[in-house]
Amino acid sequence: MRTLILTLFVLLFVPSLFAQEQRVGIDPAIIEAYPEPNVEPLYPQDNMLYDRVYRRVNNPLQMFDNPNGSIVQDMGKGFNFVTLAGVSQPEWEQVTTDRWMRTTDLSEEVTISRFGGVFFPENPLPYQMAWTLRHLRASSTPGADENPDNEFMYRYTRVNLYTSVEVDGKLWYQIGVNKWVHQFDVARPLPVERPEGINTEKWVSVDLYEQSVIAYEGTRPVFATLISSGLAEWPTNEGLFNVYFRRERTLMSGAEGLPDFYYLEEVPWTMFFDDDIALHGTYWHDGFGYRRSHGCVNMSITDSNWLYRWSSDVRDFNNPDSVDIAVYVYSSGTYD
């Protein structure tokens, strides 16, 4: 009798439970119909990425007027980068400030990020797109460990987010058939309604939670990418701003004599919008999608160049009342 009851239980209930498990997520046919985001990538241009040679300063920042000459700048250790001028002598390199540094004080050539954002189609995407923020293999079910049988996905892979399930207070997104990732492993560019107070046709939104930027023409999002905004101790301020000053290349330096001293030569495609906080290109890291700056909005050189040129016609310099592009900084969520 016990054997019969157990057999009936297995026949009646186990298939039902299995079917419920199989129903987690959307129909595989839908995933097959929309396998990846319908966006156009912005490809990097080698002649723009590699037109300069950047080096990190390993030792205290000391610059000389000539090889074996006198010290004309001595600012100590920090997060310091210089650009080589292409002129060298044994054990010495000239930098763009027309000064010289010892070769032993400089690192090897900096590796430039090749990351680029995407252009949105005219019609809204059927599913929210996202970028993966680390190398990973997706889990087979929400909340599970990575499945070694799932294909390896590189950081910055573009994926569709088909649906989500909450596990222990956090979202897990379905990115394929039996493929799920934790919300912290992806960044989503989330279009927002045009805020009141935006005073330019072209404008950008900066989402500090998702670490993304979206460029708009009117109410339509046209371009999106990943950023790195200010760390908690040097936050990027929320609010509505306008770019007030722009430069194709500029020196950025601050906190001299303090532990967070930095000196960055030739920061590319720079647009200041909040005091000394700017949107700008970044040659010294490839960690987009995470906060890591001194307050500025770091972008790849590819993305910052596009944004700079796309917005260059916003301000009419023949009209004294004209302003440069509006920048809306907000947060779509709260950091834990």
What residue ranges belong to the model's regions?
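Bacterial N-terminal signal peptides
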Residues: 6-16
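Short, solvent-exposed interaction modules
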Residues: 117-163
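Boundary regions of SH3-family modules and the immediately adjacent low-complexity/disordered segments
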Residues: 20-51, 96-129, 174-203, 234
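N-terminal post-signal-peptidase region of extra-cytosolic proteins
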Residues: 65-70, 79-80, 189-201, 225-230, ...
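Cell wall/extracellular polymer interaction/catalysis modules
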Residues: 145-237
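Positively charged n-region of N-terminal signal peptides that target proteins for export
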Residues: 1-4
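SH3/SH3-like beta-barrel superfamily modules
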Residues: 22, 69-107, 151-187
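Exported/periplasmic cell-wall-interacting domains
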Residues: 197-199, 223, 231, 235-240, ...
